[in-house]
């Protein structure tokens, strides 16, 4: 209907509702919304689809048989009543629903109606709820809203979601070089060599010199835009880093023209000279300084000038001292260099021609100074210690672990036998172990927790009421016996008995606790199931009986070391470190040991695993039995003990140091370290001189001098009284330095100065004074006796008290220290070169540098840091921070680009930029210019390097970086970004189309369209709704046309009608499809095939009427029923032909046969052997039995029964199905199950079946022979075997397995030690060497064999083998019963080893050790006694002196050449030499000869074989062996070497000229440069 009519109808309904409402109070009439009308503001019309129901008529038809009168088909009558099928039609109605469009009025989007308002006048804030669905900001408008996105994002098509804007896609984002997009923004990047301008888009070339001067110290030269190089100012050169500059060294070329030293100072070359030279007048050449002429040499005798130095010389008879200046008299005496302070050596000192040679005793070595002896860590060099080693000063000490003690050799360790002392605290037995011991108990006992006491395994205790003893097994009950077992079967029985009697009264403890229910353990938590490792339970099930080798409460612990056997109660008898097998006790011997008990160690002289390796130790040294290392006797050392101790060492291995005073001692005994003193000394360490009146070796001789005359303690000669200051036989020798007085017996007490040889008065050197010369000269004095006055030293210098020269302070030089150091030098004597660089000034005293402007650092090597300038960079720059830096020298500001002014505090004036503000800006459209780079900052709407380009379409604002936010491609203002909407769009973003019924620019025009037509928002053209046409859509579609503007033709066929709007066809009955072109599908009928048939089982539906046409086998209105039984086929008109009561299929008529039948009509029974449903089951009857074809039940033959005839007839029955009872006379008869004939039962035979089967036969009629073995009997009925004790198996053919016995082998043997038991009785059959009920004991020591019945016949300590009685002889014995001792020349076990003794040595039969005769030693007596020893065992010390050897047998001394006498104590008399002093010397008269070689010992001035020739010219001294050192043509004395000067020469070597001549030389011009060098 028209809109207004609908509105009026709605108003009527509302008015009627208001009239029917009950009356309300007049005071508060309710405000109800006014119904919306299209004329009200902001009201929009909508088409709403609703379901509308209405009745639809439907014509139905059905058929029935009615009686009718008819004329045909009547028999003899004209009319008759017949049956006729009639179709009846009737009208019915159904409710049909269809969707209809209805116009409703609602508030336009963005508006709402409040009570009392006419129309929609209230704006809706869509942003208040869930932000309006916007991802970004939500903006509410009057009547609507819109979503916005943050800058850099844009709205997607849904108007709500924001998506990142890739600004780089449009004009590269305005970037000059590279644009990088980021979420919500972007950034510009520049190529290498460019930098980004302040606008963030423009790239400026980097002028590398403008940034920090390019890193250059002086000047930066720009090569390209990005490249530069550094350049130095004149007189400077570039360093390797290419940036810093250093001044060119003037000394680099030609040493600056200097002869010696060239040094740069403030850029100029300054020459210097080496010490001993001075600069000449040209300031470049160096000339020698004559130290002798200037008095700088300070030589005691004479001075000789040399180039650059000088040399002091001494007069004849004197020699130059170590200081190179003092001269000392030459004493013609050979001085022992070791006498003074032991030559500086810490231990031994030996005098040589080159000075003292230090030596160290054994265990020490020389330190780097070659004088001090330091200890050697002997333990690190594999000493002889067997266990532990501790290093000591000069040696080491061996020690042993607990349970061991040190052997007498000081190296090896021997086990301590703890059992030897107090029985080791053991109650029963004690067995010594290596390093320890172990207690053991007798059989039937076990060790207590203290591992010493013994507790009985089963204790017999007399009950308190006096009844018989009862047994309580341990460990459940702790009860002590009232008697003590005897520990040993020896002579101590009386003592043990006394001790037992004493203790009986104390051992009366009763039980502690008892475990119940066959449990045991300290907490009764263990049972027999816990026994491990083959352990079995005791008969009382109160503990585990462990096998050999195991112990512990549950047999989970192996035997402790050195124990074995049952309960680990047997002690191991292994010796020499052998280990014991925990089960059998067999010994496993270590290398070098053999024998059943490891009792056979290696004999002396052999070692190794099998004692086959021969020791190589000399001097009777003993050998380690495993490794063969030699263990030396005292006085010997070396790998083979073949070396005698070196001097000053003694003891085993020469490991001890002699404590003798070596300078006073002749020798140290290498065995015990006793000291043999030199003549003149005595004491244990030879530390004391002979007492007055005694002399000689040991001070045993008394002096024979007159009273008051001293005696020489060495020779006993009487000393002569010399005048003070002299000594010697003829008193011709002056006292040596440091002594004075009579016989030079006084010692000087001067401090570093000599004394007068007569009076002892100190002779002070220059600069010293005082009685002992210990004081320096007073201030202002110097020289001998401090008599000279010091010169006037300047600048705080002091005077040298020895020479009087001024000692200048650092920084000053000159004879009076009046001059400061030359430029470039500083310190004491101005000898240290300054290290100041870059024109830095050096302090002459400290050398500290004062840097030139622009430099700093300790050596002025570092340029000023940025922000500082001036000397030492002490001034801060006064330039504006960040706008410029200052010159490091002058401090003037050097402005950065874009700044100017004295302090770089001003930016460039407008329109200019760059360094010094000299470049002009090029910006357009009023853009601002950067004063540093000249880059332009564009105003809104412009872009480009110079702002010459307007913003591209879609962008606006500053830098055009804002994207327009307009919809539908609307442009925006380039400056403000506001959207310019085209026709048909409106809103801030032009996102909204014109409201309904409006169009054009700004939606200002009204549309004139009807019938639901829409209006084009741009042109106002009407777009008609489907089914209408015309300019204003007022014309309906003509028939045959439909759709929008009625442009489509209808396609309906077969009488179908067409809808003018959608073109849909309405089909008649029986047709369907879009164009009614298809007949109804099966199951559907009526108009449009909209009704469904309900035909079942494949019935066909009539497409017009819906009636069902049923298939074969089915019937009923809907074909829902199958044919009745006995019928089948179409309309169920055919009848079944099945037999045996079988039914047939209602469609095909096929027969369903019952079980046991088959065939087309079920007329045949199942074939033989098959039965059941479809005859598919196979009969299970025996071959001779048949089964029923229906049930499968078997028809059994006579004698069998059961479902499968598997059971024979029960005894007493027979026949078919076992239905008959047997009629046999008694139980000894059996009935045949098939025929019932009676025969004898199994196990019986004979007439009347009364006789049992004889032994060995069984079965019916006793026809079968028994097959039982080993005495087994068989059952007479079944033949089953009954085995006797000791056998088992079906035929008793198997003997009991080892360890079991008795009937069915059900009992376990209790034999020990692996013994077998009798399989019948269980009695143990012990192997030879074992005895006891359970074979748990070995044979006693003197018994052997089976049952230990045989007595051993071993003698001399031989051990008897418990099995066969064979004897194991101890060392040194042989024979079947060890009855023979080893014959001569043989030794060891069974005397199998052959002796190797030499030099008539005899062999010890046990170990094979050789017993050497006098003069020989060694394992085989192969060595004669070492030097210094003789006699039996080389134990006697030779008393020969002078190191002479003695005869090793007799001890007679064999004197060396030059000595004779019984002990070689006498030297050869004058004129004799050689062995025994029997040869005569052949020397000039009065000349002695060497007592050994006989060579003549020429006095000074003589030479030749017989010393009968004078020295030739230029030679002097003893044997003329010294060369003269005389100059000036002088000759030297052939005896003393003193020079005899000629031609006015003087000095000790006659090379000095008189003083008048030397003083005439010119003095040097520059005394400040003098140097003293020698």
UniProtKB/Swiss-Prot annotation:
One example GO MF annotation: scavenger receptor activity
Domain EGF-like: 123-163, 164-204, 205-246, 247-287, 288-328, 334-374, 375-412, 415-455, 520-556, 564-599, 607-642, 650-687, 695-732, 740-774, 782-818, 826-861, 869-905, 913-948, 956-991, 999-1034, 1042-1077, 1085-1120, 1128-1163, 1171-1206, 1214-1250, 1258-1293, 1301-1336, 1344-1379, 1387-1422, 1430-1465, 1473-1508, 1516-1551
UniProt-annotated stretches for the region Disordered: 1555-1574
InterPro entries per the UniProt record, alphabetical: cEGF, EGF-like_Ca-bd_dom, EGF-like_dom, EGF-type_Asp/Asn_hydroxyl_site, EGF_Ca-bd_CS, EGF_extracell, EMI_domain, Growth_fac_rcpt_cys_sf
Expression across tissues: Expressed in lung.
Places the protein is found: Secreted
UniProt domain EMI: residue ranges: 40-122
Disulfide bonds listed in the record: 44-108, 74-80, 107-120, 127-138, 134-147, 149-162, 168-179, 175-188, 190-203, 209-220, 216-230, 232-245, 251-262, 258-271, 273-286, 292-303, 299-312, 314-327, 338-349, 345-358, 360-373, 379-389, 385-398, 400-411, 419-430, 426-439, 441-454, 524-537, 531-544, 546-555, 568-580, 574-587, 589-598, 611-623, 617-630, 632-641, 654-668, 660-675, 677-686, 699-711, 705-718, 722-731, 744-755, 750-762, 764-773, 786-799, 793-806, 808-817, 830-842, 836-849, 851-860, 873-886, 879-893, 895-904, 917-929, 923-936, 938-947, 960-972, 966-979, 981-990, 1003-1015, 1009-1022, 1024-1033, 1046-1058, 1052-1065, 1067-1076, 1089-1101, 1095-1108, 1110-1119, 1132-1144, 1138-1151, 1153-1162, 1175-1187, 1181-1194, 1196-1205, 1218-1231, 1224-1238, 1240-1249, 1262-1274, 1268-1281, 1283-1292, 1305-1317, 1311-1324, 1326-1335, 1348-1360, 1354-1367, 1369-1378, 1391-1403, 1397-1410, 1412-1421, 1434-1446, 1440-1453, 1455-1464, 1477-1489, 1483-1496, 1498-1507, 1520-1532, 1526-1539, 1541-1550
Keywords: Disulfide bond, EGF-like domain, Repeat, Secreted, Signal
Signal peptide segment: 1-27
Stretches assigned to coiled coil: none
Biased composition (Polar residues): 1555-1568
Source organism, top-level taxon: Eukaryota
Any one GO CC term of the record: extracellular region
Entries under SMART domains matching the protein: EGF (SM00181), EGF_CA (SM00179), EGF_Lam (SM00180)
Full protein name: Multiple epidermal growth factor-like domains protein 6
Name of the gene: Megf6
């Amino acid at each position: 209907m028209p809109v207004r009519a609908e509105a009026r109808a709605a108003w009527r309904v509302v008015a009627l509702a208001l009239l029917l409402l009950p009356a309300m109070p007049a005071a508060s009439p309710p405000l109800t919304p006014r119904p919306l009308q299209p004329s009200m503001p902001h009201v929009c019309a909508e088409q709403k689809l609703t379901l509308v129901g209405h009745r639809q008529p439907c014509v139905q038809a059905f058929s029935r048989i009615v009686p009718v009168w008819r004329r045909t088909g009547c028999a003899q009558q004209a009319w008759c009543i017949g049956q006729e099928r009639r179709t009846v039609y009737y009208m019915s109605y159904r409710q049909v629903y269809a969707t209809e469009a209805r116009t409703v009025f609602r508030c336009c989007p963005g508006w709402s109606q409040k009570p009392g308002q006419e129309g929609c006048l209230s704006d809706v804030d869509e942003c208040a709820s869930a932000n309006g669905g916007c991802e970004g900001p939500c903006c509410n408008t009057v009547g609507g809203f819109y979503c916005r996105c943050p800058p850099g994002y844009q709205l997607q098509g849904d108007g709500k979601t924001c998506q990142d804007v890739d600004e780089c896609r449009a004009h590269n984002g305005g970037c000059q070089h590279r644009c990088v997009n980021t979420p919500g923004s972007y950034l510009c990047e520049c190529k290498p060599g460019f930098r980004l301008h302040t606008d963030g888009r423009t790239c400026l070339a980097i002028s590398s010199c403008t940034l920090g001067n390019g890193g250059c110290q002086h000047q930066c030269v720009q090569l390209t835009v990005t490249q530069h190089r550094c350049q130095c100012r004149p007189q400077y050169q570039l360093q390797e880093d290419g940036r810093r500059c250093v001044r060119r060294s003037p000394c680099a070329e030609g040493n600056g023209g200097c002869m010696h030293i060239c040094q740069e100072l403030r850029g100029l070359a300054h020459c210097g000279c080496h010490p001993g030279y001075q600069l000449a007048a040209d300031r470049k050449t160096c000339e020698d300084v004559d130290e002798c002429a200037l008095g700088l040499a300070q030589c005691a005798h004479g001075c000789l000038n040399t180039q650059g130095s000088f040399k002091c010389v001494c007069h004849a008879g004197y020699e130059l001292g170590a200081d190179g200046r003092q001269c000392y008299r030459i004493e013609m005496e050979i001085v022992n260099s070791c006498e003074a302070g032991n030559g500086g050596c810490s231990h031994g000192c030996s005098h040589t021609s080159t000075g003292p040679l230090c030596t160290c005793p054994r265990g020490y070595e020389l330190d780097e100074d070659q004088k001090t002896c330091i200890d050697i860590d002997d333990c690190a060099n594999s000493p002889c210690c067997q266990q532990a080693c501790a290093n000591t000063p000069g040696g080491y000490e061996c020690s042993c672990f607990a349970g061991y003690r040190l052997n007498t050799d000081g190296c090896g360790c021997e086990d301590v036998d703890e059992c030897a002392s107090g029985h080791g605290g053991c109650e029963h037995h004690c067995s010594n172990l290596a390093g320890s011991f172990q207690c053991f108990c007798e059989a039937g006992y076990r060790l207590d927790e203290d591992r010493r006491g013994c507790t009985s395994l089963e204790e017999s205790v007399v009950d308190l009421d006096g009844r018989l003893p009862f047994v309580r097994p341990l460990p459940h009950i702790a009860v002590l016996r009232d008697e003590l077992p005897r520990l040993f079967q020896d002579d101590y029985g009386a003592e043990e008995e006394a001790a037992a009697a004493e203790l009986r009264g104390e051992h009366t403890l009763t039980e502690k606790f008892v475990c119940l229910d066959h449990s045991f353990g300290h907490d009764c938590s263990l049972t027999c199931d816990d026994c491990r490792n083959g352990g079995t339970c005791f008969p009382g099930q109160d503990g585990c009986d462990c096998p050999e080798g195991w112990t512990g409460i549950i047999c989970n612990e192996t035997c402790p070391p050195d124990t074995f056997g049952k309960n680990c109660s047997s002690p191991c008898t292994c010796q020499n470190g052998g280990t014991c097998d925990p089960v059998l006790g067999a010994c496993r011997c270590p290398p070098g040991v053999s024998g059943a008990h490891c009792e056979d160690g290696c004999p002396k002289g052999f070692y190794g695993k099998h004692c086959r390796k021969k020791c190589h130790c000399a001097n009777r040294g003993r050998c380690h039995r495993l490794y063969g290392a030699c263990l030396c006797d005292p006085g010997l050392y070396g790998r083979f003990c073949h070396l005698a101790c070196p001097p000053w060492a003694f003891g085993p291995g020469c490991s001890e140091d002699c404590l003798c005073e070596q300078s006073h001692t002749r020798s140290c005994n290498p065995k015990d370290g006793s000291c043999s003193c030199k003549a003149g000394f005595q004491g244990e360490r030879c530390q004391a001189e002979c007492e007055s009146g005694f002399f000689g070796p040991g001070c045993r001789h008394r002096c024979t001098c007159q009273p008051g005359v001293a005696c020489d303690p060495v020779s006993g000669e009487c000393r002569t009284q010399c005048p003070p200051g002299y000594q010697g036989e003829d008193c011709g020798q002056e006292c040596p330095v440091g002594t004075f007085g009579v016989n030079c017996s006084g010692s000087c007490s001067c401090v570093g100065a000599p004394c007068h040889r007569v009076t002892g008065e100190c002779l002070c050197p220059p600069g010293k004074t005082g009685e002992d010369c210990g004081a320096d000269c007073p201030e202002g004095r110097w020289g001998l006796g401090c008599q000279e006055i010091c010169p006037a030293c300047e600048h705080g210098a002091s005077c040298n008290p020895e020479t009087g020269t001024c000692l200048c302070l650092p920084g000053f030089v000159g004879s009076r220290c009046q001059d400061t150091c030359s430029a470039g030098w500083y310190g004491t004597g101005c000898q240290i070169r300054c290290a100041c660089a870059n024109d830095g000034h050096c302090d002459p005293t400290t050398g500290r540098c004062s840097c030139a402007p622009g430099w700093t650092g300790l050596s002025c090597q570092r340029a000023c840091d940025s922000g500082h300038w001036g000397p030492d960079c002490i001034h801060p720059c006064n330039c504006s921070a960040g706008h410029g830096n200052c010159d490091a020298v002058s401090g003037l500001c050097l402005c950065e680009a874009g700044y100017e002014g004295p302090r770089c505090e001003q930016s460039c004036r407008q329109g200019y930029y760059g360094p010094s503000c000299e470049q002009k800006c090029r910006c357009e459209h009023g853009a601002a210019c950067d004063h540093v780079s000249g880059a332009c900052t564009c105003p809104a709407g412009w872009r480009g390097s110079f702002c010459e380009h307007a913003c591209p379409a879609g962008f606006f604002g500053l830098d055009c970086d804002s994207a327009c936010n307009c919809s539908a491609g609307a442009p925006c203002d380039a400056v403000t970004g506001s959207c310019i909407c085209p026709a048909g769009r409106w809103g801030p973003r032009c996102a909204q189309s014109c409201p309904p019924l409006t169009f054009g620019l700004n939606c200002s025009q009204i549309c004139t369209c009807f019938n639901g037509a829409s209006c084009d928002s741009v042109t106002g053209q009407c777009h008609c709704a489907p089914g209408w046409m015309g300019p204003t859509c007022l014309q309906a579609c003509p028939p045959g046309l439909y759709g929008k503007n009625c442009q489509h033709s209808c396609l309906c066929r077969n009488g179908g009608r067409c809808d003018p709007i959608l073109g849909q066809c309405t089909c008649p009955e029986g047709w369907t499809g879009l164009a009614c072109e298809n007949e109804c599908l099966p199951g559907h009928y009526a108009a449009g095939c909209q009704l469904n048939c309900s035909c079942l089982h494949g019935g066909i539906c009539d497409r017009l009427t819906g009636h069902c046409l049923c298939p074969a086998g089915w019937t009923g209105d809907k074909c829902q029923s199958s044919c009745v039984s006995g019928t089948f086929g179409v309309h169920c008109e055919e009848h079944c032909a099945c037999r045996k009561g079988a039914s047939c299929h209602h469609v095909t008529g096929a027969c369903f046969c019952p079980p046991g039948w088959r065939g087309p009509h079920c007329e045949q029974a199942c074939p033989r052997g098959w039965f059941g449903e479809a005859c598919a089951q196979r009969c299970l009857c025996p071959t001779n039995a048949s089964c029923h074809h229906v049930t499968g039940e078997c028809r059994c033959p006579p004698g069998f029964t059961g479902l499968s005839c598997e059971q024979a007839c029960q005894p007493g029955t027979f026949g078919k199905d076992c239905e008959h009872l047997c009629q046999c006379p008694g139980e000894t008869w059996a009935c045949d199950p098939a025929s019932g004939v009676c025969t004898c039962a199994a196990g019986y035979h004979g007439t009347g079946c009364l006789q049992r089967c004889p032994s060995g036969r069984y079965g019916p009629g006793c026809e079968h022979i028994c097959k039982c073995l080993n005495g087994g009997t068989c059952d007479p009925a079944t033949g089953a075997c009954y085995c006797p004790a000791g056998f088992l198996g079906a035929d008793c053919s198997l003997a009991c397995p080892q360890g079991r016995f008795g009937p069915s082998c059900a009992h376990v043997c209790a034999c020990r030690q692996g013994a077998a038991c009798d399989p019948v009785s269980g009695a143990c059959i012990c192997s030879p060497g074992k005895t006891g009920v359970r074979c748990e004991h070995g044979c006693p020591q003197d018994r052997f064999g089976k049952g230990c019945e045989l007595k051993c016949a071993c003698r001399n300590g031989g051990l008897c083998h418990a099995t066969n009685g064979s004897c194991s002889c101890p060392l040194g014995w042989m024979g079947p019963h060890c009855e023979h001792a080893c014959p001569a020349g043989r030794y060891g076990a069974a005397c199998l080893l052959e002796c190797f003794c030499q030099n008539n040595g005899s062999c010890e039969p046990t170990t094979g050790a050789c017993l050497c005769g006098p003069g020989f030693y060694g394992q085989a007596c192969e060595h004669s006694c070492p030097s210094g020893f003789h006699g039996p065992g080389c134990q006697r010390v030779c008393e020969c002196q002078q190191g002479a050897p003695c005869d090793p047998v007799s001890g007679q001394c064999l004197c060396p050449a030059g000595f004779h006498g019984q002990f070689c104590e006498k030297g050869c008399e004058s004129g004799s030499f050689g062995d025994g002093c029997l040869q005569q010397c052949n020397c000039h008269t009065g000349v002695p000869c060497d007592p050994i070689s006989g060579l003549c010992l020429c006095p000074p001035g003589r030479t030749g074989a017989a010393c009968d020739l004078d020295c030739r010219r230029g030679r002097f001294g003893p044997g003329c062996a010294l060369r003269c050192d005389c100059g000036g043509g002088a000759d030297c004395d052939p005896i003393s070497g003193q020079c005899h000067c000629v031609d006015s020469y003087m000095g000790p070597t006659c090379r000095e000229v008189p003083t008048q001549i030397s003083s005439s030389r010119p003095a040097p011009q520059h005394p400040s440069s003098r140097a003293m060098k020698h």
